[in-house]
A protein has these predicted regions:
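Alpha/beta-hydrolase-fold enzymes
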Residues: 26-33, 184-189, 200-344
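N-terminal cap/lid segment of alpha/beta-hydrolase-fold proteins
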Residues: 54-87
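Short, surface-exposed "cap/lid" segments of acyl-processing enzymes
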Residues: 85-142
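Alpha/beta-hydrolase active-site loop
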Residues: 162-183
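Short beta-strand/loop motif that positions the catalytic acidic residue
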Residues: 360, 366-368
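Acidic catalytic loop of the alpha/beta-hydrolase fold
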Residues: 371-375
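Short alpha-helix in the alpha/beta-hydrolase fold that links the catalytic acid
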Residues: 376-385
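Catalytic active-site module of serine/aspartate enzymes centered on a nucleophile-bearing elbow/loop
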Residues: 398-429
């Protein structure tokens, strides 16, 4: 019986990926004009004719827009979008806008912060309040898919070693690169940081590895949809992924990325959600809240969001997340005993040492919810038990799922205003 369930789940995965692979070339390489980041590529292709929608949205709200390319120490090229100041402000103004980073979560990109209208969008609310806003991206999503050596690390090739990364590399390479670049460009010694989901997890991991860097670089920290660990996560999606070992399927397909679909696939998802928004809502609710409808996201607008989501990631990253759930350890990537001994000199990978958080002195604000199956108070204790609560405030929200923190208009009054007050209280503006 277990074998049949595993086979059925595996066949479904194969069917989905068959559709994906059919839209690639015979070599497994994506057509550059309809790549895994098709929406972004489309806007880039037509950039000279019409400003991209995200740039237009920012400009229409009354702000300048900039795009920056950031090189990591291991050769990945990340994209960051900047909202530096109002259009009405002189270029050589003496006004200093303190920088703040907004870092997306798993399967996501910087698009996610801009899907609401300007009056409900966190980055534009922050910009209106006087901040220099940076929407950063981690490697391998729809916005950051470049490498300085594209011959050997070709993101358009679904089999490429470009995709050999997980949240560990995002924490060790991407986050420091983004922070250092923004400090250099703005001239500020410290920046503030807002992370959603994985965006908060990589912050914690970097602190566990290099606490001095974070203490010297971060002024204030905010986490929404906070995930410190997923040892007891109630997400049916995580539980299914951990229960049904998909590694044999993935190894057979030899495909290394996940949800990095091309334009055809995005079109299918978008049209499906447009004509069947109720079914689409049910699927999304299953993913982000185990089927519970919090009624915070407009289902009629949901289909629009799938022009820009999911943002994509690597299979190795997903595997690393599932290892955390199955092994009940927040540790480095588990390659198996033989390779672990070679890399770590141990049968099992070392855990990230959160005991260093006992010396954590950065003012922090964290949000969790009773309707978020990816996060709960029990798992949060893996972090908070180490923290001096003098520096940390935890907000327990009711009836917010994992995406409501980003895509619900209710978040403006329930969360974003509180974030502004927190930042102002800690002298960021």
């Amino acid at each position: 019986m277990k074998y049949k369930k595993r086979t059925s789940f595996g066949l479904l995965t194969v069917m989905i990926y068959f559709i994906y692979l059919k839209s690639t070339s015979k070599t497994g390489k994506l057509d550059p004009l309809v790549s895994e980041s098709s929406h972004y590529r489309y806007f880039q292709k037509h950039y000279k004719k019409t400003p991209p929608v995200y740039q237009q949205k920012i400009n229409d709200a009354g702000f300048f827009f900039e795009e920056h390319k950031i090189l990591t120490s291991d050769g990945y090229i990340l994209t960051a979008w900047r909202i530096p100041r109002k259009l009405s402000e002189p270029t050589f103004s003496d006004i200093k806008h303190e920088p703040i980073i907004l870092q997306h979560g798993l399967f996501d990109s910087s698009f996610t912060w801009l899907l609401l209208d300007a009056s409900h969008s966190l980055p534009l609310i922050l910009a209106e309040s006087g901040y220099d806003v940076w929407l950063t991206n981690t490697r391998g999503n729809a916005v950051s898919f470049e490498h300085e050596n594209m011959n050997n690390f070709n993101s358009y090739d679904v089999y490429s070693k470009y995709w050999d990364f997980s949240f560990h590399e995002m924490a060790v390479y991407d986050l420091p690169a983004n922070i250092n670049y923004i400090k250099k460009i703005t001239g500020f010694d410290k920046v503030s940081y807002v992370g959603h989901s994985q965006g908060g997890l990589i912050y914690n991991i970097l602190y566990s590895i290099n606490p001095t860097f974070i203490e010297e670089s971060i002024k204030n920290y905010v986490s929404v949809g906070t995930v410190a660990a997923i040892f007891t996560a109630e997400s049916k999606l995580i539980q299914l992924g951990a229960k049904f070992d998909m590694s044999w399927i993935l190894n057979a397909l030899k495909v290394k990325n996940f949800f990095c679909f091309n334009e055809k696939f995005y079109s299918i998802i978008n049209n499906f959600c447009y004509y069947s928004n109720k079914i689409c809502s049910l699927i999304v609710n299953f993913i982000v809240s185990n089927g519970k409808d919090t009624n915070r996201i407009n289902p009629k607008k949901l289909f629009e969001n799938f022009l820009y989501a999911p943002g994509g990631t690597s299979f190795k990253n997903i595997s690393h997340w599932l290892q955390m759930y199955k092994n009940k350890r927040l540790a480095m990537y588990d390659y198996g005993k033989k390779k672990n001994r070679k890399i770590y000199n141990s049968d099992i990978p070392p855990e990230y040492d959160f005991s260093v958080f006992q010396n954590y002195k950065i003012k922090s604000l964290m949000y969790i919810s009773d309707s978020d199956p990816f996060s709960n108070e029990n798992d949060l204790k893996h972090l908070t038990d180490q923290l001096n609560r003098k520096y940390v405030t935890i907000r327990k929200m009711s009836n917010y799922n994992h995406l409501d923190f980003l895509w619900s208009e209710d978040a403006k009054n329930d969360i974003y205003k509180d974030i502004i007050l927190f930042l102002q209280k800690n002298n960021i503006s």
